[in-house]
């Protein structure tokens, strides 16, 4: 039977698949729309397995906060190209993943992928992901998620660079007003910009400090001038350098990026806001995700990629 342009258009709108793929599906199923959708799903799942060898290092971080502000989630979903990361279908899918993660009881990403997909419980999250790979046309990966709950305060969220970075901040406080919320947002922006590894120096292990001291001592011993200095001077140098490093990697010790004097720490900024609002405020922790962080991107020759797609 003849396949009409209207049928192709309808199937394309239903599935988001390519025009030629839709035409092939309709031809193979003799114009049966439901069977054509299944045909594309099956074809898509097979294609998804093929695409899985390609590196998904771009993508999007999405945050979601409950209405009462007590609970929040951040997810990272990767794609192969920045172009797809800006695609509306991809962004909507990431929002759906965030909604799923908000309500999950999964302890890790593997358990999350194995649970039923809330929008279609006949599929698992992993199977729904494979279907999206077929529709969008690139390898994708739900890389990670994190939930933060704070009953005695609220959780602030912030996304930066169009979702390249997603941040959650756990704020314990007995006062929740606009000023305190603005403070939390400013702290989240600080985290996005300066990438702290810890909330405070109390979280840094003694093993980490000792390891850093050993490295610094080795550096000094390998320096002809510094190695000749008295032991007490060397000890003071190491202590000073450790202190400087902790100031860089611990959020509350960092210099607040908006400090008018260029010296005020994040801790002092939080203290000032607490005092001004008659509040007790503690920044208990944070989560910072950056898309593709730690993923090695695969570089391919563009001409070779085009030739590959053209079948040459």
Task: Write out the residue ranges for each language-model feature.
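N-terminal assembly/interaction segments in proteins that build large macromolecular machines
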Residues: 2-312
């Amino acid at each position: 039977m003849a396949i009409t342009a209207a049928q192709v258009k309808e199937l394309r709108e239903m599935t988001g698949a390519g025009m030629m793929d839709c035409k092939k599906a309709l031809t193979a199923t003799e114009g049966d729309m439901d069977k054509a959708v299944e045909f594309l799903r099956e074809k898509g799942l097979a294609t998804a397995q093929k695409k899985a060898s390609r590196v998904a290092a771009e993508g999007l971080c999405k945050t979601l906060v409950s209405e009462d502000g007590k609970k929040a989630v951040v997810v990272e979903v990767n794609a192969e190209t920045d172009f797809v990361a800006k695609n509306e279908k991809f962004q909507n899918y990431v929002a759906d993943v965030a909604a799923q993660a908000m309500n999950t009881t999964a302890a890790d990403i593997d358990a999350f992928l194995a649970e039923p997909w809330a929008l279609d419980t006949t599929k698992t999250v992993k199977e729904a992901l494979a279907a999206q790979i077929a529709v969008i046309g690139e390898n994708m990966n739900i890389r990670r998620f994190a939930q933060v709950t704070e009953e005695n305060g609220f959780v602030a969220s912030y996304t930066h660079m169009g979702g390249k970075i997603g941040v959650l901040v756990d704020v314990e406080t007995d006062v929740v007003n606009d000023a305190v919320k603005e403070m939390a947002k400013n702290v989240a922006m600080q985290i996005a910009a300066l990438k702290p590894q810890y909330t405070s120096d109390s979280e840094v292990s003694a093993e980490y400090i000792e390891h850093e001291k050993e490295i610094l001592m080795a550096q000094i011993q390998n320096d002809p001038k510094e190695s000749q200095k008295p032991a007490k001077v060397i000890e003071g140098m190491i202590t000073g350098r450790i202190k400087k490093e902790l100031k860089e990697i611990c959020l509350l010790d960092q210099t607040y990026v908006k400090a008018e004097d260029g010296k005020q720490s994040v801790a002092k900024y939080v203290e000032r806001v607490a005092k001004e609002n008659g509040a007790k405020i503690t920044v208990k922790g944070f989560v910072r995700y950056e898309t593709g962080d730690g993923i090695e991107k695969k570089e391919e020759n563009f001409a070779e990629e085009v030739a590959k797609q053209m079948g040459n």
